[in-house]
Amino acid sequence: MKNNTTQSLLLLLLFFFFFFEISHSLSISSNAPLSDTEVRFIQRRQLLYYRDEFGDRGENVTVDPSLIFENPRLRSAYIALQAWKQAILSDPNNITVNWIGSNVCNYTGVFCSKALDNRKIRTVAGIDLNHADIAGYLPEELGLLTDLALFHVNSNRFCGTVPHKFKQLKLLFELDLSNNRFAGKFPTVVLHLPSLKFLDLRFNEFEGTVPKELFSKNLDAIFINHNRFRFELPENFGDSPVSVIVLANNHFHGCIPTSLVEMKNLNEIIFMNNGLNSCLPADIGRLKNVTVFDVSFNELVGPLPESVGGMVEVEQLNVAHNLLSGKIPASICQLPKLENFTYSYNFFTGEAPVCLRLSEFDDRRNCLPGRPAQRSSRQCSAFLSRPSVDCGSFGCGRSVVKPSPPIVALPPPPPPSPPLPPPVYSPPPSPPVFSPPPSPPVYSPPPPPSIHYSSPPPPPVHHSSPPPPSPEFEGPLPPVIGVSYASPPPPPFY
């Protein structure tokens, strides 16, 4: 009797579970906006398919035997796209309504081209579902699209994680997942994409650290702004060959690595609204090609280096909302292409007259005598009475391995005189090693209190260096894919 009761309870629980699952699926399949509860349900549902981090997640796609495909690769693409269609839970614009049948090259948002390794066959080379407002997740079967060069799904409602099987996309050139609801740790699968040049993860919910290997990849553009990443920039940051990197609105802290000045290809860099708390590298002026330089809304200290006057291509320069001090060098305000110089909300005490003749500048809330809208004398006195900053105390340079002291071999004893018994020689004592007296301790001022600001969105980014040419498409091209990265950053999605 007891066993029958237990079985009845189990059956009842299973009934309620499946009823809950079906009711949620039906409600989510409607065109109404997804609530936060439904988003969490989708994320849980996605995780149910994972057996472990590297396990398969199948969508049980059945291929109708009556369907005829041009080649096996398009058959694999059909499986991938049908699995994705099953994983889509809301498609208010009916983008995927024509994802039916074997002619996948006619699917909306799918673009075919001749295979690079066999020009006689067509294969799926690009997917562009930007601004489609689709909700769902990315199934593992997308790894079957092994000829894919472009994958653009920005401004949708995809959530969950990036499939591990993406590592099979060896030809993937551009990956744009921006302005969605992806979450979890940094998708390390992107480190295994050998052809990747453009990576856009901005406006998502990724969190944790960013692997330092990202900055060793041969990328041209990195957008990871507006996430929840929290880490210190690694020493190899300057090894990155990118022309554009945007890290704004995360939780980075610590140093701006001195290796930054070695980024010879860099055109645009935006660090705004993080927690960086060091000095600017003294030789920052070596960045001769930078047009946009934004380190606003951080906790940077010390002077504005004189070498900034060597950034001859800079057009937008923003160091506002920091703890910088000293005088603004005249050479900065004389930069030939400078259009906008913002240095408000710091503690600068002097600026060259030429700075006041710039077409656009902002010097408010400093300690500049004779200028309007400055800090109070009390604020300025309190800050400027602190000990001067020792920029070397932050240890922001690459670590240097000190070589071991050379081993000095003692000279061999002279040969003994024949008529005398050989004398016994004791090796001479080693010369005393002089230890210099310890240098006096360098006073490091206490770190400034954390300052939290309400940050505006980053300035529009204008990219100037196009990547290598994308593969040719036989069908209509998606709008502006990979040419100068002209798509504006998506708005925050809340």
UniProtKB/Swiss-Prot annotation:
Record's compositionally biased regions (Pro residues): 422-479
One Pfam entry name: LRR_1
Predominant location: secreted
GO CC annotation terms, alphabetical: extracellular region; plant-type cell wall; plasmodesma
Classification via InterPro entries: Leu-rich_rpt, LRR_dom_sf, LRR_extensin-like_regulator, LRR_N_plant-typ
Residue ranges of the region described as Disordered: 422-482
Signal peptide residue numbers: 1-25
Keyword Signal assigned: yes
GO BP terms: cell wall organization
Keyword Transmembrane: no
LRR repeats: 121-145, 146-168, 169-193, 194-217, 219-240, 242-263, 264-287, 289-311, 312-335
Function (record text): Modulates cell morphogenesis by regulating cell wall formation and assembly, and/or growth polarization.
Protein name: Leucine-rich repeat extensin-like protein 4
Designated gene of the protein: LRX4
